[in-house]
Amino acid sequence: MMRRADCRRVLAFVILLLALVVSKDAHAQSAAPAPQPGDYPAGEPFRGRAAKVDLRPPDNREFRTRLKEAAGEPANFAGHYVLTTWGCGTGCKRGAAVDLKSGKVIFLPGTVCCWAIDVPQNFEPVEFQLQSRLVVMNGQLNEQGPEGPHYFELRDGAFKPVTSASDKR
């Protein structure tokens, strides 16, 4: 039969092992690699004549000048979209993707603001690439929650969340 002191040592050892396993698992989760643009490939870049922008929805009409200007540019996102952003206050951006094939407008899933003060010179609050469906919004979404990268995939006509700075908390 084990003495009480031995039982305490065994129990302390088991608790220590559990704490190590839990902290190692938490570290592994927080160290998960960030989504990469290549993991969300888009089709070939669109080179045809752009469709007329759909201005029927009220939000589209409100930003018609920006959206029409964007539709006059070559594709810069997800193969056949032009992603455009504009200011919505001091240190705040919002934007939309214009489908050059259909004229449909898909607004970003919110505004992004409040990014760090000491950002690199090449910092962009909204990052995207021509041959990827991944968008990264760097800062706070809709002026709330954690500051950091928030990843979205353009899929089925909408920006779907992939992962976010709030997932790491």
Regions found by a protein language model. Give the residues of each.
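Bacterial N-terminal signal peptides that target proteins for export
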Residues: 2-13
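Bacterial N-terminal signal peptides
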Residues: 12-21
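Terminal domain-start segments
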Residues: 25-73
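Acidic, small-residue rich beta-repeat scaffolds with periodic aromatic anchors
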Residues: 28-49, 125-169
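Surface-exposed loop/turn elements that mediate protein-protein interactions on large endomembrane-trafficking
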Residues: 53-58, 97-109, 150-162
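Structural signature of eukaryotic scaffold interfaces centered on beta-propeller domains
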Residues: 70-76, 124-131
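Mid-length scaffold segments of soluble, non-membrane domains
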Residues: 73-110
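Surface-exposed loop and turn segments in beta-propeller and other repeat-based domains
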Residues: 110-117
